[in-house]
Amino acid sequence: MSNENRTCSFCGKSKSHVKHLIEGENAFICDECVSNCIEILHEDGNDGTPSESAGGEPEESGKLPTPAEIVANLNDHVIGQEQAKKALAVSVYNHYKRLRHPKAGANVELSKSNILLIGPTGSGKTLLAQSLARKLDVPFVMADATTLTEAGYVGEDVEQIITKLLGKCDFDVEKAQRGIVYIDEIDKISRKSDNPSITRDVSGEGVQQALLKLIEGTVASVPPQGGRKHPNQEFINVDTTNILFICGGAFAGLEKVIRQRTEKGGIGFGASVHSKDENADITKLFGIVEPEDLIKFGLIPELIGRLPVIATLEELDEDALINILTEPKNALVKQYQALFGMENVELEFEEGALRSIARQAMERKTGARGLRSIVERCLLDTMYRLPDLKGLKKVVVGKAVIEEGREPELVFES
């Protein structure tokens, strides 16, 4: 169609009768029709901009759960760790409250409440972070700090974390910029001493510096659809300022650093006395950790400064592990009972068996993470034969199954 013959698809006026004729895909609209559309929208009370609440802030869908509601939800998935849950709930609530009311703190700059979780392997650090993201319905991604390298080195550079986060929300930049990133094993990239390194450190201090930029807020350039970077390519820009970062680690050996700070040492009446329960000692020491201890451990001061909320998790004892096996909504015992139920077979774990499973996990020092492998091992042969065992009504797992490797008791219909 020639320029002279083009007409507005709405009013039919030709280009010569209007000031502007805007071209779209197989359609045109003139400036007069655009003005009419704007007037109609204003009359309906909708000018196309986000609606504002009484406080003048853009409203967001859904009610922000209170700290108490967040903790109640975490209790459904994670056993114990009450102090850590409370610290997480308050920090996360304040973070998203700040995002929902950007003008409320116009006179005061509200900083981000990134979180550092310190606790032994299998104590629930990862599960807490996952459960938080699920409750808040925000994009969530996990990264292993030990796999990260500085940009320019072989390996996964820190910006790929943002690529993964974008992938979790179908490359919706707005959603990604309000997501949660959990970085595990942060303690494994500590530098060897608290003195700055004069050499290149591909997987330690250098990675901390790269993470620092991401955590404190930067615009990360991400390849579209998660491809690899190459010249002459358009990038997606993601502002990490409002992404909540949760870092976690076991920090094995940190207790020694804290002891050096808190105890004078020596012999005689001034000597320090340690409890026979080493786990209780470590839990108490982690509870009084200071930023200077983390610096001595090997984290750079700038990174610690960007992780203002420090929450410590306790070593799980035998009773806590038994509760983990049976109490949460997705408890391991409930999962296996559901699997057996699909074959119309009841699965029962005796109290002695549960205690033995918990004890073995403690001996292996794997915490809750090691429970599944123990249960899987004791039920493997039974699950292999299960579809072919006609008339089977019930499977009973006793103490001897766990401790002596015996077969579970099989109860058939009479």
Curated annotation (Swiss-Prot):
Keywords: ATP-binding, Chaperone, Metal-binding, Nucleotide-binding, Zinc
Keyword Methyltransferase annotated: no
Keyword flag Zinc: yes
GO molecular function: ATP binding; ATP hydrolysis activity; ATP-dependent protein folding chaperone; protein dimerization activity; unfolded protein binding; zinc ion binding
Gene3D superfamilies: 1.10.8.60, ClpX chaperone, C4-type zinc finger domain, P-loop containing nucleotide triphosphate hydrolases
InterPro entries: AAA+_ATPase, ATP-dep_Clp_protease_ClpX, ATPase_AAA_core, Clp_ATPase_C, Clp_protease_ATP-bd_su_ClpX, ClpX_bact, P-loop_NTPase, Znf_CppX_C4
Function, as annotated: ATP-dependent specificity component of the Clp protease. It directs the protease to specific substrates. Can perform chaperone functions in the absence of ClpP.
Annotated protein name in UniProt: ATP-dependent Clp protease ATP-binding subunit ClpX
